[in-house]
Amino acid sequence: MMGSAQTLATRHAPNPRGLVMGMGLKTLQKRLSHLTGNAIRDYRMIEEGDRVMVCLSGGKDSYALLDVLLRLQKRAPVRFELVAVNLDQKQPGFPEHVLPEYLASLGVPYRILEADTYSTVERVIPEGKTKCSLCSRLRRGLLYGAAEEMGCSKIALGHHRDDILETFFLNLFYGGRLAAMPPKLRSNNGRHVVIRPLAYVPEPYLERYAERMAFPIIPCTLCGSQPDLKRQMIKAMLREWGEIEPRRLANIFSALQNVQPSHLADKELYDFINLVGSVQPGEDPVSALETPHGDGFPAAEVLSGVQRHDPQSA
């Protein structure tokens, strides 16, 4: 456990939708660097000598992730490498020139992977069904393979705080389980560590930063045609909550870091089965209380004025 809920809540920004609109670029950069740096430090995401593969999709989140990591790299107490990787999934109309030109302008090492996962998803998933799950699995496998080839020890993804909260409520409402996106995890093949350095960053910061930086955003034609996804409904719910009570989302995220298994109901996380008290079966309940308890006086004294009823004498 990393600290009390109150302390944890202060480490993360409250819902900043109104506040962020008035922020200047420098203020936004400092805030993003601060939140990202905290997450990296809290979970030891990046260590000395790491070669970090930054997955770049062409969306606002991954652009911001690369930008912030490049800034942190210049002043970090540890030395690490960054390699940007994009997967060209052969979606119709995908502007293949945008990312290579952008990455070349930054002078950052990069690699463009090419795989026609678009056709696979279109062929396998029926019309009107959600394509995100299969698309994600195919993409993940290709990225793991690329990380292996390039000798990358860490794989950095652009998921932010609100992505994590959305996943939590999706699992809660539709899956019947308490689970979200962890800030750090071992990859499926066990060879790499996947990190989410933007885990503390609320989405409005990234929306505003993308506008101010004029990132060359590339829309996803697979997801953009599915407006009724459950995740989008959850997103709308969280956005409304944030407007009603600005600290609510920060407090929910803090709760994910402050789990108390003994106050839930999962028998695998807490041994409820073997949980017993000190009173033995058949023992006189008042005499059992003669031993001083944590409050410093015999609990039996509290019961001294209570009339005892013996069913045998009734």
UniProtKB/Swiss-Prot annotation:
Family membership noted in the UniProt record: Belongs to the TtcA family.
The protein's name: tRNA-cytidine(32) 2-sulfurtransferase
Cofactor(s) required, per the database record: Mg(2+); [4Fe-4S] cluster
Chain ranges for the short sequence motif PP-loop motif as given in the UniProt record: 57-62
Compartment list: Cytoplasm
Chain's role: Catalyzes the ATP-dependent 2-thiolation of cytidine in position 32 of tRNA, to form 2-thiocytidine (s(2)C32). The sulfur atoms are provided by the cysteine/cysteine desulfurase (IscS) system.
Biological pathway: tRNA modification
UniProt key word Repressor: no
Matching InterPro entries: Rossmann-like_a/b/a_fold, TilS/TtcA_N, tRNA_Cyd_32_2_STrfase
Annotated GO CC locations: cytoplasm
GO MF terms held by the record: 4 iron, 4 sulfur cluster binding; ATP binding; magnesium ion binding; sulfurtransferase activity; tRNA binding
Note: The thiolation reaction likely consists of two steps: a first activation step by ATP to form an adenylated intermediate of the target base of tRNA, and a second nucleophilic substitution step of the sulfur (S) atom supplied by the hydrosulfide attached to the Fe-S cluster.
BP terms from Gene Ontology: tRNA thio-modification
List of residues binding [4Fe-4S] cluster: C132, C135, C223
Subunit structure: Homodimer.
Catalytic reaction annotation: cytidine(32) in tRNA + S-sulfanyl-L-cysteinyl-[cysteine desulfurase] + AH2 + ATP = 2-thiocytidine(32) in tRNA + L-cysteinyl-[cysteine desulfurase] + A + AMP + diphosphate + H(+)
Organism: Alkalilimnicola ehrlichii (strain ATCC BAA-1101 / DSM 17681 / MLHE-1)
One of the Pfam families matching this protein, by short name: ATP_bind_3
EC top class, as a word: transferase
Subcellular location, principal: cytoplasm
